[in-house]
From Swiss-Prot:
Compositional bias per record (Pro residues), positions renumbered to this chain: 1-21
Modification Phosphotyrosine, positions: 392
Record InterPro entries: TEADIR3_omega_loop, WW_dom, WW_dom_sf, YAP1
Protein source organism: Mus musculus (Mouse)
Protein name: Transcriptional coactivator YAP1
Length: 488
């Protein structure tokens, strides 16, 4: 017999191996992927599964919800199914109103007016149930109806016909053999509350009698009561009413303390006088004040006249040949500016009434009143920026080109020696005047009015070609340390 021929070996499949089938016919779990590889599962029924989830939520009746175990069949303790017993009788649930069944809470209407608060609140007193403070002399005050929040001890005797017993859990209850009932409420609390009930109150007494320590009302005040029993006060002096007790006013209390502590001094008897003398004597204080006021006004007038005299002397010292009438008036107006501020804008005899309003306006603006304002003086535009004698301009002409003032041809012969002499004629106090800046150039004669057209030819003759050549000046080669130009 020939040996059986072996079948040729099958080549290894190139694709993934099919899942093995178990003997039961169910596919086995796929093998684990090798390390570093991920397996992505693609399911075609994902949309169907999502719809099923939404349907289970939207339509719970039609959804196949698995049956849960009933609560009774679960292993829960017995206390889970028993409701808690009422704890109104226990210490944890005790309230202040333990005798709610016997006595209902009674709230007394409190007075909304401040008049119910008497001065007895400051002094030792007690607080009644109605909220009114009464003094020591008042009737016995009623205590609060609040009950104790703790259990009454067992040694306190019970009322007749009552008996206390305890349940199996140790809770106390009470037996009433009179009517054969049981209750959780302690009858001893009702007894204590009945003892605290005040006696029937007497008819309403006016609060003035109730609090005798408050003292009498101030002069001109009266106490009254409305139909509801609320107290108010009438002030006959100014014919007003108020809820507030005037005796509670701190000003009245202070005055009352002062009058009580300080001894009362009788006024000295007045000497017999005639009817006219009596009227004058009554207003002596007013007369003294008027006399002092008149003295102050007279002193102020004397100072004003003295100041005017000083200014007139200063005007007389000015040379009449160089100071004409309009400029004297200008100086007088300048000198009167401080006086106008002190006197409230009253013009002096030197100035006219028509000028006072404009001077007052210019003074309040805190500027020079003679700069481009009014018809009294107008400063012309200056073209000699470096040669003006005004204190408002800054000379910028180099000193090298103005060696001496004599070289300028101004057309008018001006002596250099006359300028210092004229400046020396002005008093020094003119420079110290507040709010003014006396321009000496405006106070000189007409000879000092140097026109710019006459000054320009002399400047053009003195200027060199280098200073007029801007390009050569701005060149870097022309600038050195010895240059007369200073760049800022």
């Amino acid at each position: 017999m020939e040996p059986a021929q072996q079948p040729p070996p099958q080549p290894a499949p190139q694709g993934p191996a099919p899942p093995s089938v178990s003997p039961a016919g169910t596919p086995a779990a796929p093998p684990a992927p090798p390390a570093g590889h991920q397996v992505v599962h693609v399911r075609g029924d994902s949309e169907t599964d999502l719809e099923a989830l939404f349907n289970a939520v939207m339509n719970p009746k039609t959804a196949n919800v698995p049956q849960t175990v009933p609560m009774r069949l679960r292993k829960l303790p017995d206390s889970f199914f028993k409701p808690p017993e009422p704890k109104s009788h226990s210490r944890q649930a005790s309230t202040d109103a333990g005798t709610a069944g016997a006595l209902t809470p009674q709230h007394v209407r409190a007075h909304s007016s401040p008049a119910s608060l008497q001065l007895g609140a400051v002094s030792p007193g007690t607080l009644t149930a109605s909220g009114v403070v009464s003094g020591p002399a008042a009737a016995p005050a009623a205590q609060h109806l609040r009950q104790s929040s703790f259990e009454i001890p067992d040694d306190v005797p019970l009322p007749a016909g009552w008996e206390m017993a305890k349940t199996s859990s140790g809770q106390r209850y009470f037996l009433n053999h009179n009517d054969q009932t049981t209750t959780w409420q302690d009858p001893r609390k009702a007894m204590l509350s009945q003892l605290n009930v005040p006696a029937p109150a007497s008819p309403a007494v006016p609060q003035t009698l109730m609090n005798s320590a408050s003292g009498p009302l101030p002069d001109g005040w009266e106490q009254a009561m409305t139909q509801d029993g609320e107290v108010y006060y009438i002030n006959h002096k100014n014919k007003t009413t108020s809820w507030l007790d005037p005796r509670l006013d701190p000003r009245f209390a202070m005055n009352q303390r002062i009058t009580q502590s300080a001894p009362v001094k009788q006024p000295p008897p007045l000497a017999p006088q005639s009817p006219q003398g009596g009227v004058l004597g009554g207003g002596s204080s007013n007369q003294q004040q008027q006399i002092q006021l008149q003295q102050l006004q007279m002193e102020k007038e004397r100072l004003r006249l003295k100041q005017q005299e000083l200014f007139r002397q200063a005007i007389r010292n000015i040379n009449p040949s160089t100071a004409n009438a309009p400029k004297c008036q200008e100086l007088a107006l300048r000198s009167q500016l401080p006086t106008l501020e002190q006197d409230g804008g009253t013009p002096n005899a030197v100035s006219s009434p028509g000028m006072s309003q404009e001077l007052r306006t210019m003074t309040t603006n805190s500027s020079d009143p003679f700069l481009n304002s009014g018809t009294y003086h107008s400063r012309d535009e200056s073209t000699d920026s470096g040669l003006s004698m005004s204190s408002y301009s800054i000379p910028r002409t180099p000193d090298d080109f103005l060696n001496s003032v004599d070289e300028m041809d101004t057309g008018d012969t001006i002596s250099q020696s006359t300028l210092p002499s004229q400046q020396s004629r002005f008093p020094d106090y003119l420079e110290a005047l507040p709010g003014t800046n006396v321009d000496l150039g405006t106070l000189e004669g007409d000879a000092m009015n140097i026109e710019g057209e006459e000054l320009m030819p002399s400047l053009q003759e003195a200027l060199s070609s280098e200073i007029l050549d801007v390009e050569s000046v701005l060149a870097a080669t022309k600038l050195d340390k010895e240059s007369f130009l200073t760049w800022l």
